[in-house]
Structures are given as structure tokens and as C-alpha cells.
């Protein structure tokens, strides 16, 4: 792609974003996030397709932008009442941002030391990582569709009228398929980037995060559904995240 083409593409991107902000003033932040993720996806695909040396980075960018955009779109389709700009999960938390930053720093340093180790190899760790990301994201989005209005990005302390216990579909195999999907996706991203240090760190940190979250969430679900959820725990003993047991009511 020559410089003129890049200039036209940049001009088009800025123009579309500005026009969108004017037309959708009340939802300008949602529009900008959608544009940002769309441009990131396009840039990622271009890198993956046109550059052997940056192929893994391009795949990573495309996968990340797809993950966050589909979080918003899936919420819009299944639970529009809870839809907001936060549904993109771009501003998930400070630790989430720092984890992403750490992976970019490791990639940059290792690429500078030896760029050959960062090339995408479809039968190597990076290629397997792409598959892990796709499978993980598919599991998560499928779980969101199965849960419908009962799914929320934030653990709810109060039971809503439409809140139901979902036990069919993926929930008949594991109790928290959405967390399983996200766990796999997060690990897969570091395999794509060939980041050995962050791969280990992501496994430890995300496992601990989901272990704590599942424990709290299941405590609340037992308050919401009582014996119904206790029986569900017994019929579906796996949480989805390896070695995470969740909260058990021993009374």
C-alpha cells in the first residue's frame, strides 16, 4: 500500500468518525468505539496479510478488536436493556489495561532482540494460539446467547425480575462457560504473540481472577436460587475454569 492510499484511508477514517459523531451526538462514544475497533481490525488484517514479519501482531490486533466489538454486539442482541459503551469492555479495569500493556512491552522487546521468534507459524505456538482464541471467543459468545437477559458483565447483587437460572446448552456441561471462553481467549492471545513470560503470567493472573469471581458469583447465585442452584452444582460439577471449584453451600 503506497503513501497516497494510506493518506486517503486516514482521511476517510477521520471524516467518517467526525460525521458519525455529528449524526449520533447522544451516542458519540459508542460510535467512536465501533469506528476504532473497525479500523483496528482492518489494520490487523492488512498486517497479517501483507507482512510475514508482523503477521502474528496483525492476527492479535484483529482478534482483540473482534473480541471487544462482539462483546458489544452480543449484548445488543441478547440484553439491550443493559447496553452501554461499557459493553465493549475496552475500559474493563486498570489491571486489564496493565496486563495488555505488559504483553505489548514484552512483544516489542523480544521483537527488537530477535524478530524471527515472533513470526506466525501455523503449526507452532502462534498458529495454535489463533485457534485457541477463536474457540474461546466462540464459547463465550455462545454462552452469552444462551444466558440472554440473565447475562451481565457485572456481578449482580440484586436479583432482577428477568433473572433466570440457565442450565441448558453450554451450561449443561460447565457452570461458567463464558469465563471458560474468556480464560482460553486471554491465554491464546499470548500464544499468538509468542510471549512466554506473559503467557505464564496470564495463566496465573486470569485463573486467580476467575477463581475469585466465580466464588463470589456462586455465593450470590445460591442466595438467588437456593436449593435449585445447589442441585445444579451437583449435576454440573465443573465450573469450566480448570481446578476452580466455586462456592459450596455445606449447610
What are these regions (language model features)?
Residues 1-161, 188-251:
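Membrane-anchoring alpha-helices and their flanking helix-loop junctions
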Residues 154-182:
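Active-site-proximal inter-transmembrane loops
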